[in-house]
Amino acid sequence: MFKTRAKYHLGQVVRHRKHPFRGVVFDVDAMFSNTDAWYEAIPEDSRPKKDQPFYHLLAENDQSFYVAYVSEQNLVADYSGEPVDHPDVDDFFGPFSDGHYPLQGQLN
């Protein structure tokens, strides 16, 4: 039986290990669950393993905000204490406090 445990939790702020963006976790897949086309678009020498958690992030960088799908190996915790400036954060979470966002109601 396949078992995995996510390192990061819903509402946690994380940043990408290699690229200049950060975000708040709003969903987690136990293993890769996107399209083959999405995966194949990643340069072969940078492709993450599929058998690890993948995180859905409400992400931001210096220019914009967006939704990102990132493997666990490419994330690190963000300890900046700064909230994420994404317009959809309030749809999922309560006010930013103590470095994370509490869940807003029930998520499916």
For the regions a protein language model found, what residue spans apply to each?
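Generic, low-specificity signal for short hydrophobic/alpha-helical stretches with a mild N-terminal bias
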Residues: 5-7, 14, 39, 71, ...
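Intrinsically disordered, low-complexity, charged/polar segments
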Residues: 46-108
